[in-house]
Structure formats: C-alpha cells, structure tokens
Amino acid sequence: MRAYLDLCQRIIDQGTWVENERTGKRCLTVINADLEYNVGNNEFPLITTRKSFFKSAIAEFIGYIRGYDSAADFRKLGTKTWDANANLNDAWLNNTHRKGEDDMGRVYGIQGRAWAKPDGGTIDQLKKIVDNLKDGIDDRAEIMTFYNPGEFHMGCLRPCMHTHNFSLLGDTLHLTSFQRSCDVPLGLNFNQVQVFVFLALMAQITGKKAGMAYHKIVNAHIYEDQLPLMKEVQLKREPLALPKLIINPEIKSLEDLETWVTMDDFKVEGYECHEAIKYPFAV
C-alpha cells in the first residue's frame, strides 16, 4: 500500500522530534495524516511490505461492537490486546473503579453501546446508527464516539481511535474515522484493518453498498528506535497487490455480530507479503 509508505517517508522527511513523557522515548512526529480505503472494491489495506496479521484487529473491534469491558472476553474472541492495560497498568490497578482481574472499566465499547446519561440510563450509539441506516436515514449525525472525558477516570485507557462517522449517499455507505495518535510502524495497520472492516460490516448488516473509508490521524509518529528498520528495510521494499477480505455472507444483523460471529467468519484471499519486521514496541 503506497499511501502507507508515503506517510512513513513524510514523517522521516518532515517530522519534528518530540519527547514522549509516557514512554521516555523520542519520536518523529507529523500532524494530520489522511488515508483512504476503497471498501467497495474490497481493496483490503493489509500491509504487504512486512508480514501483517488481521484477525486480532478484527477480534478487538468485534469486542467493541459487543460492548465488552473485560479482557477475558477479548481473549475468548482471539485477541490479548487488553491484557496488559487491564492487569498491568499500575494507575488502573490502584483505581477504586476497577472491579477486579481483567476489568477494563468504561472504555471503548462500553461508551459505544452504553453511554451514561446524566439523568440515568444509557444511550446505545451503535444501535441508533444501524436502525437509521437500515431505514435509509442519514441525519448527518450517524456518529459513534468512545471519547468521554467525564469518565476517563473510570477506565484503564483513553481511546486512541475514538470516533466513527457514517455517511449515506443514495444506497452507498461511507465512513470517516478519527484517531488522535498513531505509532505508524506498529499500530497503523491494526487500525487500518478495523476502519475497513467496520464499514464493510455496517454496510452488510444494513443492506447498503460499501463505499470509501476515510481514516484521519492527528498525531502520526515513528519512535527513534524504529527508524533504522523503517529506513533501511521497509521503505526499500516494493508494495505488493492488496488482498481481498472475505466476510461470511450469513452475517446479516447487529444481533449476529453480538452473538455468534467468530474469527472463522473472516478470511483473506491473495495476500502476498515481504518477510516480517520486528519493530521495537514503546510500552
């Protein structure tokens, strides 16, 4: 995927050095990156200039769709992405809102499916969007956001990719997703997969055609210890043709996504890639 490599090169050429207080590492940073994925043509943005994986990213987002708040439930789906944040985060371990082992608190999917109202009760943001789209309605506010500053203290992590805005033009569904920060060598492909899959699934369960997914990143960065591999290995490789994502056509409703869907319902066809690259991870 050339756009991915172009962003990496832009960060190297134009980035500003920033000291990250959380990680204690320096990173080259640019502000504002826009990526586009043609979901209608099934051009699945799985990085080909290094070996990449997709099922963990999909599993995590299915967990968000289900409103999970336990790392154990994410593990059952096939991803361990929440284990550390739920169980190894000192600030969260000492937080009185933590309910016990594997509890994540009010993050991501909880906000999307059960946003707390000031007067009591909750709002199911996702169901409202699905119901509207099935009826051909776009009220220009088909938005699901995980970003709730009033409850940051009640969760183990602030959302990174935080808001998803659907737009319906005729019978074609588009998606614009917003991300506040991105570790480009390691994290971006994970998020690319999620943006693509979210639009593909929403189009499928609402009976619409999938159109374009627009992925907007505010702070895109490469850590200093990732630069040698990026410059000397990944950027010297030619991207290969993008694969296709095959989603089980029997997935027809939000209830299906909430109940029986597993990672066996997602397959990739035609994926060819270069060898793996083991980038350092900033904890």
UniProtKB/Swiss-Prot annotation:
Protein origin, superkingdom: Bacteria
Listed GO MF terms: thymidylate synthase activity
Location in the cell: Cytoplasm
One of the protein's GO biological processes: dTMP biosynthetic process
Keyword tRNA-binding: no
Gene Ontology cellular component list: cytosol
E.C. code: 2.1.1.45
Reaction(s) this enzyme catalyzes, per UniProt: dUMP + (6R)-5,10-methylene-5,6,7,8-tetrahydrofolate = 7,8-dihydrofolate + dTMP
Pathway assignment: Pyrimidine metabolism; dTTP biosynthesis
SUPFAM superfamilies for the chain: Thymidylate synthase/dCMP hydroxymethylase (SSF55831)
Subcellular location, principal: cytoplasm
Cited InterPro entries: Thymidate_synth/dCMP_Mease, Thymidate_synth/dCMP_Mease_dom, Thymidate_synth/dCMP_Mease_sf, Thymidylate_synthase
Active site: C160
Binding site for dUMP: R22, R180, S181, C182, D183, N191, H221, I222, Y223
Residues that, per the record, bind (6R)-5,10-methylene-5,6,7,8-tetrahydrofolate: D183, A282
Keywords, comma-separated and alphabetical: Cytoplasm, Methyltransferase, Nucleotide biosynthesis, Transferase
Subunit comment: Homodimer.
HAMAP family the record matches: Thymidy_synth_bact
Protein family membership: Belongs to the thymidylate synthase family. Bacterial-type ThyA subfamily.
Purpose of the protein: Catalyzes the reductive methylation of 2'-deoxyuridine-5'-monophosphate (dUMP) to 2'-deoxythymidine-5'-monophosphate (dTMP) while utilizing 5,10-methylenetetrahydrofolate (mTHF) as the methyl donor and reductant in the reaction, yielding dihydrofolate (DHF) as a by-product. This enzymatic reaction provides an intracellular de novo source of dTMP, an essential precursor for DNA biosynthesis.
Official protein name in the record: Thymidylate synthase
UniProt organism field: Colwellia psychrerythraea (strain 34H / ATCC BAA-681) (Vibrio psychroerythus)
Gene this chain is encoded by: thyA
